[in-house]
Every structure is written in structure tokens, then in C-alpha cells.
């Protein structure tokens, strides 16, 4: 295992400045992860854009031991072995074992949300609670990011693209390494993951599903599919947020997620006919 004080390129003001970088050998991959904070472990699985830091993760690290894992195939080594999201999730489980975690909360974003759901199914005894941010397993009405013109990409991911000082397009080398994996596990698959749908009703882990009400990648109504299939699921729409909820509404995202992790159902109003529910 190797460690650095902060992630490369991070200043004291930039997201991720308080995270240290580590690597573990697991399943034939050298896997990088970033860690910050103390308390109960919160494992974070990134989206198709790879491991990135956000103010939301900085805020969560004030209350939890946050471990953001770069999934196999998103680092310097291509992943040519995994054919399904379930296989990728099993490899992530091996990484978590190598890190030495027993029980943990689990947060997955978009592509990582689909992986997190499969991981929770594979290791339900290890996952304390599950948070899925715009998860990509059910994508009715969605748009493949590869088909979005570059000039429209930021607006699909962020509600207020004008607030992003500089938008850097994806690195071509990174895309060449990772996109075949993304397409193989997600892009070329049906928009409805039937295999996952068949297993979710047996997953008793308490789950929070969040979508931005202006998501331009995966329409937020797909959150209702998760709520219908999962026995212990709550679905929340975050106002004035697009696909990247952490980027659009960092404080709101952190407030909802931290309350859910700490208090579970006690932080939510029960659904009633007299209340407006998603």
C-alpha cells in the first residue's frame, strides 16, 4: 500500500484536499482509493467519468470515514475481463476486503450506483445502508452520453453550467481505456436491468435513491422503479439539480445523505395519501 498526503493537484481550497491516496492489490488490479475522515465507513463508487472529488464528499468526511474507490478498469489498467456489472461489483468487494473493511455504508453514483446495487445484493450482510445517486440500472428515456454533442454535455449534467469556471472535456486516453468497459457493462445493455430487477425484492438493506429533478441524462421518474422493487427504499427528488447532484447542490445532498445514514427512516415522513410523495 502506498500513501500520499493529498491527492495530486489538490490545493487546500480544492475538493479532495483533505483526502489521502492509497493503493491495494486486488483481483489482479492495482486499485487506487482516496480516504478522509473518521467514524463509520462510507464507501463511494464513482460514475462513468471516473474517480472525482466534490465538495459533498468533503462535507461527508466531516462525519464519516469516506473511502472513494477507483473501480477496476478506471485507473491505468484497462479492464478486459468483466462482462457484467455483477462481476465488477464482486471485484469491488475484493477491493473492500483488501482494505480491511467489515461493515460499511455504500454510496454509488450513476454507473457506480448500478455497481453499488449489485454489490449490496452480493454482500447484504456487510452493507449497513445504501445510497444511490441517479443510479444507471434503469434508464427508460435516457440518453447515452456518447451520443450527446460535447457542447451540450455540461448542461445535461449540471443545472447551472455557468457556475462551472472551466469545463474540461474527457481525456481521450482515459476514454479509450474506460469506455469499452462502460459500453460492455451498461451502454450496450437494455435500459431495464431485468437480472437486477429480479433480485432487488430480496434486498432488505435500507436504501435511499436520489435524482435531480432536472436530470438530463437519466430521467428522474426512473427512481420510482427502484422504490417499487426495493422493500426498504425511499425515493427523493432534489430540487434544482441535474445528473450531478453533488456538483449542483452539495450542501443539500450532504444534508439528506448524512441524515439518512445517521437516522434512516426516522428522518423521513411516512408516505400517506394526504401527502405529496414522489
Positions of predicted regions on the chain:
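Conserved HGGG/HGGXW glycine-rich cap/lid loop of the alpha/beta-hydrolase fold
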Residues: 25-78
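Active-site loop/oxyanion-hole signature of alpha/beta-hydrolase fold enzymes
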Residues: 26, 36, 67-107, 255
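Short alpha-helix in the alpha/beta-hydrolase fold that links the catalytic acid
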Residues: 57, 205, 219-228
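Flexible "cap/lid" loop of the alpha/beta hydrolase fold
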Residues: 114-122, 128-160
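Active-site nucleophile elbow and catalytic-triad environment of alpha/beta-hydrolase enzymes
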Residues: 183-199
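Short beta-strand/loop motif that positions the catalytic acidic residue
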Residues: 203, 209-211
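Acidic catalytic loop of the alpha/beta-hydrolase fold
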Residues: 214-218, 243
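Catalytic active-site module of serine/aspartate enzymes centered on a nucleophile-bearing elbow/loop
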Residues: 233-234, 240-278
Amino acid at each position: 500500500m502506498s500513501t500520499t498526503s493529498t491527492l495530486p493537484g489538490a490545493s487546500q481550497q480544492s475538493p479532495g484536499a483533505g483526502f489521502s491516496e492509497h493503493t491495494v492489490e486486488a483481483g489482479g488490479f492495482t486499485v487506487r482509493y482516496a480516504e478522509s475522515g473518521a467514524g463509520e465507513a462510507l464507501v463511494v463508487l464513482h460514475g462513468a467519468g471516473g474517480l472525482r472529488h466534490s465538495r459533498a464528499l468533503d462535507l461527508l468526511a466531516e462525519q464519516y470515514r469516506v473511502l472513494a474507490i477507483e473501480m477496476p478498469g478506471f485507473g491505468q489498467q484497462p479492464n478486459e475481463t468483466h462482462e457484467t456489472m455483477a462481476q465488477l461489483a464482486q471485484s469491488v468487494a475484493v477491493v473492500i476486503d483488501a482494505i480491511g473493511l467489515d461493515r460499511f455504508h455504500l454510496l454509488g453514483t450513476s454507473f457506480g450506483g448500478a455497481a453499488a446495487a449489485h454489490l449490496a445484493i452480493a454482500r447484504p450482510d456487510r452493507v449497513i445502508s445504501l445510497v444511490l445517486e441517479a443510479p444507471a440500472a434503469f434508464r427508460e428515456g435516457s440518453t447515452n452520453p456518447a451520443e450527446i454533442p460535447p457542447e451540450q454535455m455540461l448542461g445535461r449534467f449540471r443545472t447551472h453550467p455557468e457556475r462551472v469556471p472551466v469545463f474540461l472535456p474527457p481525456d481521450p486516453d482515459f476514454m479509450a481505456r474506460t469506455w469499452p468497459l462502460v459500453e460492455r457493462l451498461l451502454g450496450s445493455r437494455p435500459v431495464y436491468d431485468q437480472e437486477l430487477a429480479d433480485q432487488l425484492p430480496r434486498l432488505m438493506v435500507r436504501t435511499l435513491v436520489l435524482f435531480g429533478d432536472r436530470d438530463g441524462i437519466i430521467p428522474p421518474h426512473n427512481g420510482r422503479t427502484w422504490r417499487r422493487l426495493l422493500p426498504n427504499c425511499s425515493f427523493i427528488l432534489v430540487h434544482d439539480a441535474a445528473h450531478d447532484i453533488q456538483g449542483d447542490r452539495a450542501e443539500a445532498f450532504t444534508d439528506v445523505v448524512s441524515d439518512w445514514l445517521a437516522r434512516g427512516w426516522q428522518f423521513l415522513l411516512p408516505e400517506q395519501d394526504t401527502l405529496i410523495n414522489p
